[in-house]
Amino acid sequence: MGAVWSALLVGGGLAGALILWLLRGDSGAPGKDGGAEPLKDAPPGEAAAPGGGPGGGGSGGLSPEPSDRELVSKAEHLRESNGHLISESKDLGNLTEAQRLQNVGNAREYVPVGKVPDTHSRANSETSRNQSPESRVGEWRLPKGHETAVKVAGSVAEKLPSSSPLMDRAEAASLAQSAGHEDWEVVSRHSSWGSVGLGGSLEASRLSLNQGMDESRNSLVGGGWEVDGKVVSVKPRQVSIQFKVHYSTSTDVQFIAVTGDHESLGGWNTYIPLHYCKDGLWSHSVFLPADTVVEWKFVLVENKEVTRWEECSNRRLQTGHEDKVVHGWWGIH
């Protein structure tokens, strides 16, 4: 700063001196010429006393009047002062302008880089904003592996109707680029996920599939599963129970049977005949559900009618999970 101020002061002083020299040269030349001619033509007395009148130098000394030289010198002095003022005003103007430029330069130096307005970058941004999407897409350079995806996206964008402003070529290129990073698996139309309609979506088909599976799980009706509107009965696990009893009949038309509260034993309304083996042994196997408790009895049948019941309370049987042999005696638990 000190060097700048000193340079400005020296320059201002030189400019002021030059202006004063020019003003002196312009004002002194006419005065000299005008004063030389009267001195040559004037009498000796007037030349000796230019301020006196025709009567001599005594009267001139009592009432002196300003001479031409004094007027010229005063005019020169005024001009010099005026020139000095003009030069000072010019110097002050130059100093003010230099100080303003220096302040602007300092401000640019101390302002952060991100805050300084850059007209070049602003013009570039306006130019890039005015560019069409086609030119921007053309400037992008994609890897070789994604060129095919970009072409496919371009064909899809061309097939879309022109009235759709939401999908342009730039967006299609970006979608194709993002799709290029993912691995796609081709699934046949008749897959386990079912077919997706043109107006539907994969999410909708998946929801319908899950809903169908839930309905199939919760469609147990009357001990069976409901499949396509039909009830399919599911039989529980069964075990084989072999009933045996010794009884000697009096006639050949008589035989021993078993009945009980389970439907496999007749439900107390009918009976299950036992087969005669030998030595008065009757036996027969019946399938009953596993882990079930049933009540039953032996009966004597003659001419297809129950003629005798065991003389005891109802027998109870726990089927369990394995085959069993129930060997009882008539009327004895």
From Swiss-Prot:
Can you tell me where the transmembrane regions are?
A: 7-23
* Post-translational modification summary for this protein: Ubiquitinated, which leads to proteasomal degradation.
Positions in the Cytoplasmic compartment:
24-333
In chain numbering, where does the motif LIR fall?
181-187
What's the protein's topology in the membrane? Single-pass type III membrane protein
Pfam families linked to this entry: CBM_20
InterPro entries under this entry? Carb-bd-like_fold, CBM20, CBM20_genethonin_1, Ig-like_fold
Keyword Methyltransferase in annotation: no
**What GO MF terms are annotated?**
cargo receptor activity; enzyme binding; glycogen binding; polysaccharide binding; starch binding
Return the SUPFAM superfamilies for the record: Starch-binding domain-like
Free-text domain note: The LIR motif (LC3-interacting region) is required for the interaction with the ATG8 family protein GABARAPL1.
SUBUNIT field? Interacts with the ATG8 family proteins GABARAP and GABARAPL1. Interacts with several glycogen-associated proteins, such as GYS2 (liver glycogen synthase), GDE (glycogen debranching enzyme), GBE1 (glycogen branching enzyme 1) and EPM2A (Laforin).
Protein's UniProt name: Starch-binding domain-containing protein 1
Q: Which gene underlies this protein? A: Stbd1
